[in-house]
């Protein structure tokens, strides 16, 4: 069944975003004419959501997917651009973006402009900006939600993106909307997190602020017990202004909103927020207030078909199949998830077998296939900030489990989250099982390690950060996880007890320990992880 194609649910780009995207060609051409230094070009392209790979001259373009809602025609365009200008491999991120990899500098403006033609942009996908505003990937579909939060996430994005100050902040600024206490959108650890609430029959939100992962992580504090839904714009703008005004612009390592909270204290932070709200009440909200648009109509008794991916990777050809399947059998809508997967909503029950068959023919639908479900950042193989090759560790874990004949029940086993450095792009610090890349010296030799986190959780009633229990050589991680199985799943309690026993390397250190997974070269740190927390990157072993 093909439903009416209605793009009202997806993010509508404000004129400012369109103008910035069109102006980017002048920047690229100036760089190619050597009229701009590498450093100057970097300052421009990062704010456009474009990052250079470790391979010099190749770039990643991060496409904003507002609230994780993307339309079939948009996905087809992304796939086309990956084929024509990139590597043909796309990546779904933990914040619901889609990344096009391997683009050369001469084609960056082409990619940005052709995204614009289908209502997509990379602007604000990086740099000191309001980043992609996320929402539960099951918004409007989930039986646990109080109400559909995605229209509010989209509208707040449209509101903030029209303001030039949203691209001139002290550091990145992340907003998330969760529809229930399960907090699938990670709102409790966002700079500003909205939780759906219903009070006296009225839709609204409980609001948290000052959360964040990475170096010195913390859970946000409640700044609004209940605010009517129509006031989301004022709340978001007030917190943005607070950050713009009080964020630490002198010290990048303390420039996130959570440091404003840490320095001020909880009650003083709330008072700063209340002051900004009062100013907005007196002066009125600047800019146009977007409509809270209705979503694409749902199919009665429709199914949401998960498309599990391995580490968020999908080929351009397979992405095209997903897009065409959603348009042919659903409503032309696809979701990106915080678990780096895709979801096709609104598939009529009677065509589900056909849809599953098409996905299977495209090599999709297997996901972890009996291995632990792993969420991983891109890691040091491509990211210039990475310390360890997180994706290669994920592959090694799967290979080890397969070689040992271990089958994991993914429905009950904790998700393993792997970040290649302290920046926590895979959100390892709120995982039941989390791993963070680092480097330590053993007998004078620099060896890749992972710090093991256990016991993290998300909740609208109070998230809990994971506890560091050990720092283990990278080569021992697959064996450690396999040793912590119970009833077909990784047991965090066992992991807490056994991880310290894996810290010690063999007495006669094998040369493989000197190399990270996926690399033939000795492990090094120069040029890596130069963003935050250098003190954690290299430590002498005891």
Briefly describe each language-model feature range:
Residues 1-542:
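Peripheral terminal and linker regions in Fe-S/redox and tRNA-modifying enzymes
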């Amino acid at each position: 069944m093909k439903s009416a194609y209605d793009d009202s649910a997806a993010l509508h780009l404000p004129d400012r975003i369109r103008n910035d995207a069109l102006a980017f060609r002048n920047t690229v051409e100036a760089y190619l004419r050597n009229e701009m230094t590498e450093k100057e070009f970097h300052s421009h392209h990062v704010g456009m959501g474009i990052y250079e790979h470790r391979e010099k001259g190749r770039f990643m373009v991060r496409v904003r997917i507002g609230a994780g809602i993307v339309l079939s025609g948009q996905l087809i365009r992304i796939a086309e651009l990956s084929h024509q200008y990139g590597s043909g491999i796309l990546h779904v991120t933990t914040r619901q973006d889609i990344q096009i990899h391997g683009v050369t500098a001469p084609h960056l403006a082409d990619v940005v402009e052709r995204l614009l033609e289908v209502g997509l942009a990379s602007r604000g996908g990086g740099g000191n900006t309001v980043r992609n505003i996320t929402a539960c990937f099951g918004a409007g579909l989930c039986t646990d939600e109080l109400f559909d939060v995605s229209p509010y996430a989209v509208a707040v994005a449209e509101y903030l993106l029209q303001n030039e100050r949203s691209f001139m902040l002290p550091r990145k600024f992340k907003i998330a909307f969760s529809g229930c206490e399960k907090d699938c959108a990670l709102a409790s650890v966002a700079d500003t997190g909205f939780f759906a609430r219903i009070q006296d029959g009225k839709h609204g939100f409980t609001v948290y602020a000052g959360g964040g992962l990475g170096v010195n992580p913390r859970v946000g504090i409640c700044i609004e017990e209940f605010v009517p839904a129509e006031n989301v714009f004022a709340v978001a703008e007030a917190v943005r202004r607070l950050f713009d005004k009080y964020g630490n612009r002198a010290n990048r390592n303390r420039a996130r909103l959570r440091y404003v909270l840490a320095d001020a204290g909880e009650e003083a932070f709330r008072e700063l927020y209340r002051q900004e709200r009062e100013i907005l009440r007196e002066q009125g909200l600047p800019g146009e207030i977007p409509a809270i648009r209705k979503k694409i109509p749902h199919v009665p008794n429709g199914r949401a078909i998960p498309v599990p991916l391995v580490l968020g990777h999908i080929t351009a050809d397979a992405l095209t199949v997903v897009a065409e399947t959603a348009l042919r059998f659903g409503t032309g809508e696809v979701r990106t998830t915080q678990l780096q997967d895709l979801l096709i909503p609104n598939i009529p029950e009677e065509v589900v077998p056909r849809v599953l068959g098409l996905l299977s023919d495209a090599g999709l639908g297997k996901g972890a296939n009996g291995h632990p479900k792993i969420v991983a950042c891109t890691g040091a193989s491509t990211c210039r900030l990475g310390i360890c090759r997180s994706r290669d560790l994920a592959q090694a874990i799967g290979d080890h489990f397969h070689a040992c004949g271990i089958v994991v029940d993914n429905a009950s086993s904790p998700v393993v989250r792997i970040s290649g450095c302290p920046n926590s792009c895979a959100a390892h610090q709120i995982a039941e099982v989390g791993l963070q890349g680092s480097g330590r010296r053993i007998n004078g030799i620099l060896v890749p390690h992972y710090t093991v986190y256990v016991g993290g959780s998300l909740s609208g009633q109070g998230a809990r950060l994971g506890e560091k229990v050990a720092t283990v050589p990278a080569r021992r991680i697959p064996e450690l996880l396999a040793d912590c199985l119970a009833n077909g799943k990784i047991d965090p309690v066992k992991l807490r007890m056994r991880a310290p026993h894996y810290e010690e390397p063999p007495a006669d250190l094998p040369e493989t320990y000197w190399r990270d997974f996926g690399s033939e070269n000795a492990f090094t740190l120069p040029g890596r992880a130069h963003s935050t927390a250098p003190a954690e990157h290299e430590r002498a072993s005891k």
